[in-house]
């Protein structure tokens, strides 16, 4: 028997009346920490001794608990997994410490910091289990209050940043739209002035669209179009982007893993993430001697023991891409916040503070992680991890747009609960030669089909009230009318990379906001596709 085991004397039984036990139980009785002793040699491992502190903590009397198992302390919010871990430790005669929600006699709950240890006699026989306990409810409440305060601080920073950026964009859009309206009322229209106003208003819309995508990326709520690709190929694709970002004065070095595995990520969002990393590296290199950027890719195996070193990545195979600069680096106080939304050290107007938060969200939503290593005066490394995908490579080049730019009077049913959004979609599609109708919910759409109206395409919003969303409607239409093509639209998608047996989404999706020519092209692609999937 191990000499580390707790022993009480050389007796061979668990008789608590034995004279040799007096010192042990006297010590347990007089301590202020709640303690109990159980007897594993009796059926159901009952409590055979409890001190006054335990009785005061739980509200029970000794007569009520002696001879019973400790499970009377459990209740509705007690974690079954923790209970099972305690049972396993007792069965294996191991020490265990755990934090668990227990219940007093009056039904109130409390957080219990529990430590259980087996007690042996000199003959090596297990005679007791000793359990010390501590009510840590105040500590838990304080931790929760701190988390809530931190959450509210982050929320305040987030909403303040959103309001600031969107108010500026609304100012631009509203101002130029007013100018266009004023120009239309004049007897002689200044066409160039109107065109300039339209250009600036559209630019503001595009910036607002980028902002919402960055926010969704941080929240891991954006719709990702996952494709199997190789990060080495991605580096080659973004080489012109790297050169434009850093210019000739920054030395670029690469070390790419020759046998790098593939991964499934959204190539467009991956390029945006790398651009954000490059921009931060470029800014960190301003004024530095011999500025240098080093890009590397690696294969990585994360096992059970190492996963906590990789921000909790699940065990498995990963690929990584890292960008290292020899810039100014950053202190720990900034490093810990650099991926928070709207946190920026740049001057007003020089950055939104969403770049690295978007990188973080994109990596997490892709099933990976983002880690930053930095040292003041030395430089910074930002490394992204993505799960390996054994599927074949997908062509990441944009498909050639169909030569059929205009509709051929195909009939489209628009399902959108926002009348203004529906009307805009109808105007766009009608302008491109389609014949479109509007309904405001899924039930009305089904009635249109049931009444004999036939359509070539169902164009429906994803999230709608009334108990039937866009996906449910699309599935029902596909079931009843298999020849009808389907295109979904949304400004918000909870799913990440959708994986199905055919390697893609069940239905094609176009994200809001969408420029008219992009919508028309997507509609054309879906109509020309064999199964409604472009």
Swiss-Prot record:
Residues annotated as domain PAC: 94-148
UniProt modified residues of type 4-aspartylphosphate: 461
Domain Histidine kinase as annotated: residue spans: 161-390
Annotated positions of the Phosphohistidine modification: 164
SMART domains: HATPase_c, HisKA, PAC, PAS, REC
EC code: 2.7.13.3
Record flagged with keyword Transferase: yes
PTM (free text): FMN binds covalently to cysteine after exposure to blue light and this bond is spontaneously broken in the dark.
Domain Response regulatory, first and last residues per copy: 411-527
Domain (PAS): residue spans on this chain: 20-93
EC class of the enzyme, as a word: transferase
InterPro entries associated with the record: CheY-like_superfamily, HATPase_C_sf, His_kinase_dom, HisK_dim/P_dom, HisK_dim/P_sf, PAC, PAS, PAS-assoc_C
Keywords of the record: ATP-binding, Chromophore, Flavoprotein, FMN, Kinase, Nucleotide-binding, Phosphoprotein, Photoreceptor protein, Receptor, Sensory transduction, Transferase, Virulence
Pfam family, one: PAS_9
Reactions the enzyme catalyzes: ATP + protein L-histidine = ADP + protein N-phospho-L-histidine
Coiled-coil annotated residue ranges, if any: none
PANTHER family per record: SENSOR HISTIDINE KINASE (PTHR43065), TWO-COMPONENT SENSOR PPRA (PTHR43065:SF42)
Other facts: Treatment of phosphorylated protein with alkaline buffer to hydrolyze phospho-aspartates does not significantly reduce phosphorylation in assays performed in vitro. Therefore, it is not clear whether Asp-461 is really phosphorylated by His-164.
Function: Photosensitive kinase and response regulator that is involved in increased bacterial virulence upon exposure to light.
Listed name of the protein: Blue-light-activated protein
Phylogenetic classification of the source organism: Bacteria, Pseudomonadati, Pseudomonadota, Gammaproteobacteria, Pseudomonadales
């Amino acid at each position: 028997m191990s000499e580390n085991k707790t022993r009480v004397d050389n007796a061979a039984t668990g008789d608590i009346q034995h004279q040799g036990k007096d010192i042990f139980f006297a010590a347990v009785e007089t301590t202020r920490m709640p303690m109990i002793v159980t007897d594993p040699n009796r059926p159901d491992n009952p409590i055979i001794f409890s001190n006054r502190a335990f009785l005061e903590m739980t509200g029970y009397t000794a007569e009520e608990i002696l001879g019973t198992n400790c499970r009377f302390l459990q209740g509705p919010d007690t974690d079954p997994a923790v209970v099972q871990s305690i049972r396993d430790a007792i069965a294996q005669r191991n020490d265990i410490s755990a934090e668990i929600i227990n219940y007093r006699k009056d039904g109130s709950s409390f957080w219990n910091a529990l430590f259980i240890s087996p007690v042996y006699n000199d003959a090596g026989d297990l005679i007791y289990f000793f359990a010390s306990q501590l009510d840590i409810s105040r500590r838990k409440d304080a931790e929760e209050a701190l988390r809530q305060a931190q959450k509210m601080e982050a929320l305040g920073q987030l909403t303040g940043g959103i309001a600031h950026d969107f108010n500026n964009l609304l100012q631009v859009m509203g101002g130029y739209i007013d100018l266009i309206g004023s120009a239309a009322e004049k007897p002689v229209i200044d066409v160039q002035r109107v065109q300039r106003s339209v250009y600036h208003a559209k630019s503001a819309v595009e910036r607002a669209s980028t902002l919402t995508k960055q926010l969704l990326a941080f929240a891991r709520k954006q719709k990702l179009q996952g494709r199997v690709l190789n990060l080495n190929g991605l580096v080659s694709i973004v080489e012109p982007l790297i050169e434009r970002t850093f210019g000739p004065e920054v030395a670029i070095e690469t070390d790419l893993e020759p046998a790098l595995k593939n991964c499934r990520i959204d190539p467009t969002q991956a390029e945006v993430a790398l651009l954000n990393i490059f921009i931060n590296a470029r800014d960190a290199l301003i004024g530095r001697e011999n500025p240098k950027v080093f890009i590397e890719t690696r294969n990585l195996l994360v096992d059970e023991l190492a996963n906590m070193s990789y921000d909790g990545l699940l065990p498995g195979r990963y690929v990584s891409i890292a960008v290292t600069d020899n810039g100014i680096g950053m202190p720990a106080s900034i490093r810990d916040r650099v991926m928070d939304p709207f946190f920026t050290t740049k001057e007003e107007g020089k950055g939104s503070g969403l770049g690295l938060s978007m990188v973080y969200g994109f990596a997490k939503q892709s099933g990976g992680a983002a880690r930053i290593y930095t040292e003041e005066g030395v430089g910074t490394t930002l490394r992204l991890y993505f799960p390996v995908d054994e599927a074949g490579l997908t062509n990441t080049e944009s498909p050639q747009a169909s030569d059929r730019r205009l509709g051929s009077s195909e009939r489209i049913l628009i399902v959108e609960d926002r009348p203004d959004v529906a009307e805009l979609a109808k105007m766009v599609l009608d302008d491109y030669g389609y014949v479109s109708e509007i309904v405001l919910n899924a039930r009305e759409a089904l009635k249109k089909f049931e009444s004999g109206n036939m359509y070539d395409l169902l164009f429906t919003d994803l999230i709608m009230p009334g108990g039937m969303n866009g996906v449910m409607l699309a599935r029902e239409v596909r079931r009843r009318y298999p020849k009808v093509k389907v295109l979904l639209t949304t400004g918000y998608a909870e799913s990440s990379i959708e994986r199905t047996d055919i390697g893609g989404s069940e239905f094609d999706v176009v994200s809001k906001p969408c420029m008219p020519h992009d919508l028309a092209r997507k509609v054309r692609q879906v109509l020309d596709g064999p199964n409604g999937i472009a």
